[in-house]
Amino acid sequence: MTDPMFSPGQCVIYGANGVCTVDGVREMQLPYDDEAQSYYVLKPASKPGSTIYVPMGNETLVGRLRPLLDKAGLDDVLQRVKGREMPWPEDRTARHQEFNALLARRDQEEMLLMLRCIYARRRSLQKPRKHLPGMDDDIMHSCEKLLTQEFSLCLQIPPEEVGEYLHNALDGDPC
């Protein structure tokens, strides 16, 4: 069995599943496996009762696992984001592809920049009483949910306080 990088009880981020708790490592042979192998057993926070098995020998899938940020790590990310902006991609198809690729990478810095970009666009549309296109709104909500879930655990604050923390940390800039 490979030495695990993550230990039972540790919170990790796993791709689109967001925050998961490492339930342990289990040696097992699934129907499509030629032989038994070691799997990380993950419990997604957003889907109680679900279990995810990540083969420890699959570098691509294990590469999608990363430890939850701590407060110092989050503050470092916020410092790098402060004062930066992402330009609004005007082409709807290109924007959809770019934003979805960005969400798939789960890079907090990129996600915060994307949120700021979407928020700025939403504010600019409110004056002529227009709204964000549905796909942009959906991406915004997905991004907010993922970041709130992670940052709430990292900061040990209720999810509803994350927005205010980010707003203050970015000197009043909407994140």
Range-by-range predicted roles:
Residues 41-57:
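A short macromolecule-binding patch
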Residues 9-10:
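Loop/turn positions that initiate beta-strands
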Residues 57-175:
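Charge/polar-rich, low-complexity and marginally structured segments
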Residues 29-39:
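Short, solvent-exposed secondary-structure boundary/capping segments
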Residues 1-5:
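Short, surface-exposed secondary-structure edge patches
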Residues 20-22:
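Conserved hydrophobic positions within beta-strands
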